Amino acid sequence: MEKDLVSVYRPPISSAYIPTHSITLEEVWERITSKDLQEKTQRLRTLRSEGKEEEYKSLKKESLPSVTFGGTFDYRRIDPQEYREYLLRELEREKDPIKVSKMKGTIGLLEGKVGLLESSGFVIIDIDHISETGLSLQELKDRISEDKEIGVRLVFTSPSGDGLKVVCRVSSQITDTDSYKTAYNSLRHF
């Protein structure tokens, strides 16, 4: 696997937050297959199989870390106001003066920025509701893993147990939202 880095975010999943650190795809795989995450994932799948969809969604959001496969970020946000409020809450709890200074600086620099530090060249494809296709999860995973055309680097089962996450290398570096969309759309046939 490549040494390109991706950002990791602690739970809860939010539209605006600061990554805790960066790791390689190999380390992503190690975390996904770790005992801790396997236990959390199994708990989620049990809730789903029992028809407890709202509990499943809530626990998933609150218990699983997330990753931005597109590269490393100094922050990630969708709504600038929500992100600003998040930072202000974090400032109240943070004791490290260096982190406090960085957060205060970030609050002033938010508008119009995505926070991408370095592109990994990866795009992630979510394939949901596989059980509805008539294919087995393993069969589809095997077929995708063997496809040399789409540059597959990592394939894993989604927390629901009924989907796949497929990380692909694209030929061009992704530097902004438009280039990400172009790269993603190049894989739509998939």
Residue locations for each model-derived region?
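Histidine-centered divalent-metal-coordination microenvironment in nucleic-acid enzymes
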Residues: 125, 153-175
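Helical (often loop-to-helix) elements that flank the catalytic cores of nucleotide-handling enzymes
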Residues: 134, 139-143, 170-190
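Generic "edge-of-domain/loop-turn" microfeature
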Residues: 13-15, 74, 132, 162, ...
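Structural alpha-beta junctions
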Residues: 53, 61, 146-154, 189-190
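A short, contiguous, amphipathic alpha-helix enriched in charged residues
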Residues: 122-150
